[in-house]
């Protein structure tokens, strides 16, 4: 639809963005040594965030939206921790690190054979959306809350996968392909950020490539 | 945030998109003759949609996201019908009409002094998202549902407002400025499409311009 737009191409180009996705069977999945998590509990995490904040100020998180095809429907790749929490692959930036460098580092750390692998292999594309929150609160907003002086930000990036690759995942994490239709508005299971991903992708034409 | 990205500028540009918004007080609001609605009831509407479908096939709807500033927070302009239903300004395309031409026509029809006014005055920008549905069902999906052969599509476009203009609204409609924070995830009051707008805007840096 809308392919008959001829005027004003600079503004309609955006509406025609495409993403090619490949069958899940094109990818190889293996495991590697477990990742050591820094915090045992939520309160440990908050303590660590506070001390990091004191040392470095606010840090941005970057997360990746990775898609594959299964049963003719786009599926989102999610990491699952302890058979419960779902996360998009990603994490916090180091002080001074760019969004793209940080996301590549995190993706290699969590999804590649070697942490020091070829990070350029990750094709980090456009920012799809951002979520903001008060310093140490859990409530997320898709806009900068009016009363917040020092917000924390999570940015989502579209990462286009090649037609084949290996995913090597720490053995204490599971990498799952979940249908967009299951994720959409399913806040309870997937949380605010993940359950909103189908909407952020809605302007893209998703092409299923048969191999 | 993210302003320190220097590599790979083609893919980070998208993450830096900006929207300038102006105070509500910069705009003039007036009224004009009521719009005649084609349907009295939902069942009238479905009957009309079916007969249109038989005559023209499926038609795309286009809707505008228009922002103003009030109390230092971005507000979304919504039309309200009968003190109840909220709608983004827009409507269905005519057969063969482009997204941009159709949206400009609808915006002039609902928000300008004259229907035949200068439609180019509306700066229709990028597509923010799309919603799909089965032919005559009301359930909306932000992805093409796998089983649907002939989906209907609603496309949302960002329309940047100039620093001043007149809005002349049919007297049976109200034009309201609603804070993004009130719209966000408020499905009950605003419906699926409108309540998702803050998330679709989240990748933009919204600049409040003081006049």
Predicted regions and their residues:
Chain A
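N-terminal leader/linker segments that precede catalytic domains of diphosphate-processing enzymes
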Residues: 1-211
């Amino acid at each position: 639809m809308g392919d008959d737009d001829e005027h004003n191409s600079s503004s309609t180009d955006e509406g025609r963005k495409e993403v090619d996705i490949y069958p899940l069977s094109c990818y190889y999945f293996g495991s590697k040594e477990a990742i050591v998590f820094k915090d045992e509990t939520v309160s440990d995490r908050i303590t660590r965030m506070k001390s990091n904040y004191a040392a470095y100020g606010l840090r941005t998180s970057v997360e990746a939206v990775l898609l594959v095809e299964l049963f003719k429907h786009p599926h989102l790749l999610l990491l699952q921790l302890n058979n419960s929490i779902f996360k998009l692959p990603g994490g916090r930036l180091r002080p001074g690190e760019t969004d793209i460098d940080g996301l590549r580092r995190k993706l290699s750390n969590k999804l590649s054979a070697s942490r020091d692998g070829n990070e350029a292999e990750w094709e980090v594309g456009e920012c799809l959306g951002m979520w903001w929150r008060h310093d140490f609160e859990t409530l997320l907003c898709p806009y900068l809350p009016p009363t917040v002086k020092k917000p924390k930000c999570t940015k989502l990036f579209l990462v286009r996968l090649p037609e084949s690759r290996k995913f090597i995942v720490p053995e204490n994490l599971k990498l799952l392909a979940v249908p967009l239709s299951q994720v959409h508005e399913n806040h309870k299971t997937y949380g605010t950020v993940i359950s909103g991903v189908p909407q952020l992708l809605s302007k893209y034409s998703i092409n299923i490539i048969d191999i």
